[in-house]
């Protein structure tokens, strides 16, 4: 099996397939994604999420914000399971979605834990990390506010955000309050989309 042109082991493929089946089952009663996108689970959600880990397999301690249906957090945790190392802390304040995430992690053997708290208070519980991810959550300025506590604790922190075609306007807006280094990775899924890699985040004084 290949995802985004990269080979995936049989073990990881089986974990991903089990996650997708769980997702379909839970989506009938818990609104994880729009029903209209269920036919594109692999191409639109799994593969899009897998880009995060494929771009940066080195970080061993991740935080995924607004994890929702597990994209990209559970997908990253599944890839880490193959390595037998690393961890993803998934932050999701919706109790139903948090319950799904717990079951997904347990049944796939993925390496992670779920924290049913608001993002604004997550840094009080999870004090350190190497990398942060978020998908379809908020604009960059707000995301930077969320991750700033971890950036202060770890100058080497990297963040990875899936963004659509309007990302340039978000970048310009964020420059008003923040200094940061930016690498734009073209999405392997959608021509107009990117994965933004953020480092050296500092609040302007």
Swiss-Prot record:
Catalytic activities: guanosine(527) in 16S rRNA + S-adenosyl-L-methionine = N(7)-methylguanosine(527) in 16S rRNA + S-adenosyl-L-homocysteine
Homology family: Belongs to the methyltransferase superfamily. RNA methyltransferase RsmG family.
A single cellular component GO annotation: cytosol
Top enzyme category: transferase
Residues that coordinate or bind S-adenosyl-L-methionine: 66, 71, 119-120, 135
E.C. no: 2.1.1.170
Function as written in the Swiss-Prot or TrEMBL entry: Specifically methylates the N7 position of guanine in position 527 of 16S rRNA.
Listed Pfam families: GidB
Native source organism of the sequence: Agrobacterium fabrum (strain C58 / ATCC 33970)
Locations listed in the record: Cytoplasm
Entry keyword set: Cytoplasm, Methyltransferase, rRNA processing, S-adenosyl-L-methionine, Transferase
Protein's UniProt name: Ribosomal RNA small subunit methyltransferase G
Primary localization: cytoplasm
Coiled-coil region list: none
Gene that produces this protein: rsmG
GO molecular-function terms, A-Z: rRNA (guanine-N7-)-methyltransferase activity
Record's keyword annotation contains rRNA processing: yes
């Amino acid at each position: 099996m290949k995802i985004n042109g990269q080979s995936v082991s049989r073990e990881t493929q089986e974990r991903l397939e089990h996650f997708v089946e769980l997702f379909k089952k839970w989506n009938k009663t818990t609104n994880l994604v729009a029903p209209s996108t269920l036919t594109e689970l692999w191409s639109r959600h799994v593969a899009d999420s897998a880009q995060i880990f494929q771009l940066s397999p080195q970080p061993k301690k991740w935080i995924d914000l607004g994890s929702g249906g597990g994209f990209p957090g559970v997908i990253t945790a599944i890839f880490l399971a193959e390595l037998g190392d690393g961890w993803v802390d998934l932050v999701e304040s919706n109790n139903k979605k948090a319950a799904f995430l717990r079951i997904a992690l347990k049944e796939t053997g993925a390496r992670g834990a779920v924290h049913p708290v608001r993002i604004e208070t997550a840094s009080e519980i999870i004090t350190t990390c190497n990398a942060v991810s978020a998908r379809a959550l908020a604009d960059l300025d707000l995301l930077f506010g969320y991750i700033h506590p971890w950036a202060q604790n770890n100058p080497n922190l990297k963040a990875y955000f899936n963004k659509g075609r309007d990302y340039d306007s978000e970048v310009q807006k964020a420059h008003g309050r923040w200094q940061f280094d930016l690498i734009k990775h073209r999405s392997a899924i959608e021509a107009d989309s990117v994965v933004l890699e953020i480092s050296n985040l500092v609040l302007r004084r």
